[in-house]
């Protein structure tokens, strides 16, 4: 450095100022001028033939190498950025009006775009399954913010654990007579089901992981897809073989040799009066136990016939199913749910997923309201910039489906009985361990409730459920009007 300080060359003075700056950007920009300086000094040494120029040339080369090594070591010593990947977050909350808006607001204020969201309610509690893209460190900060919300009981990121993940999709596709055979072949290949048949259209129900959904959509594109409605992803942890049974208290039918059956309390109160989940009743908090008792005085959430107008009931309240097409941008869910929250609507069901058009998402929600109030709500939703379409499917014939994953505590002796019950409801076993079995079921609410009632004696450990998804029937057949009527007699 002494040689540099006594030199009067302008290029060397520039080098001294660059060496005194610790900024990597300045070092790299100064290094660009070194070849010019070296060639300049080489020309001086060859012209004069003295050794002073050669020494200066060697000195500049050594300084250039040191600066290059320093900049490389500084870049390599920097902490590597964590990778951005998809995260599955489970949020267990107490059911309260405006809760969805508050949770969506936490993600919106941090610029996260929720890729899918499924909300399944169970009387006074709800389980949110949210899929977002982000880094580990920032997602951990979001989880800490969610835990500060009132009535949020448990928040957990289950992305890195072995899990059973499922999704439900309804696809309405053009089906002309010449292409119907190929479509039915694809339905059998992907183990899908046809839920509605019209003259020139088919509505197909598909369940599986997100990769299967993409494959089905890609193969049906050539037939022109009319509409797609998807639930968010739901997930349950896979139980390890040989592990100790954490759910033995749940199952009286599977473990009848137990001397004492301790009553299972889903929630307990702390000293401060806050409600916290019992540690022994959950495998990790990603799902919630189902209550073994049912109060007939409480309205069943998502009941298709809840609040129907009768001679004794003149309020006109009923469950309305709304379908919205919105832009797929960060914060749009917070804006839409804010309209419901400001008007005091308690959302009973919510399913958010990608629509048939790129950049568009479809929101399917169920709210209790009168026909008059819903018409005003639809007008308010149309005023939002990011909302393209709003349809009230309540008074139209529509296909509705829900997806449920349910984990039952069974041993080897009771496993056969549970599988027999599952076969009646066309449920599938998706995971089996020494002490549990996990079933997958699709259908309407009545089907879900009926299966839960039959499985309660065996011990229901955990339940993950999507909200309701619906598409209007192209056939125009409404099965509601066929209920309660006997088949016509033929002579």
From Swiss-Prot:
- Superkingdom of this protein's organism: Eukaryota
Q: Which gene encodes it?
A: AHASS1
Q: Which PANTHER family match?
A: ACETOLACTATE SYNTHASE SMALL SUBUNIT (PTHR30239), ACETOLACTATE SYNTHASE SMALL SUBUNIT 1, CHLOROPLASTIC (PTHR30239:SF0)
Family, similarity comment? Belongs to the acetolactate synthase small subunit family.
GO cellular component annotations, sorted alphabetically? chloroplast; peroxisome
Give coiled-coil spans as residue ranges: none
Q: Name one Pfam family in it.
A: ALS_ss_C
Note the effect listed for residue 107 to A.
Decreased feedback inhibition by leucine and valine/isoleucine
Q: How does it assemble?
A: The acetolactate synthase complex contains both large catalytic subunits and small regulatory subunits. The active enzyme may have an alpha(4)beta(4) structure. The acetolactate synthase complex contains 4 homodimers of the large catalytic subunits, and 1 homotetramer of the small regulatory subunits.
What sequence ranges are listed for the domain ACT?
88-160, 321-395
Q: In which pathway does it act?
A: Amino-acid biosynthesis; L-isoleucine biosynthesis; L-isoleucine from 2-oxobutanoate: step 1/4; Amino-acid biosynthesis; L-valine biosynthesis; L-valine from pyruvate: step 1/4
Q: Which keywords belong to this entry?
A: Amino-acid biosynthesis, Branched-chain amino acid biosynthesis, Chloroplast, Peroxisome, Plastid, Repeat, Transit peptide
What name has this protein been given in UniProt? Answer: Acetolactate synthase small subunit 1, chloroplastic
InterPro entries registered for this protein in UniProt: Acetalactate_synth_ssu, Acetolactate_synth/TF_NikR_C, Acetolactate_synth_ssu_C, ACT-like_dom_sf, ACT_dom, AHAS_ACT, AHAS_small-like_ACT
Q: Does the keyword Plastid apply?
A: yes
Describe tissue expression: Highly expressed in leaves and stems. Expressed in roots, flowers and siliques.
Q: What is the effect of changing residue 98 to E?
A: Increased feedback inhibition by valine/isoleucine
Q: Where is the transit peptide?
A: 1-61
A Gene Ontology molecular function term for this protein is: acetolactate synthase regulator activity
GO terms for biological process?
isoleucine biosynthetic process; L-valine biosynthetic process; regulation of catalytic activity; response to hypoxia
Which residues are recorded as binding L-valine?
Answer: 95, 99-100, 113-114, 328, 332-333, 346-347
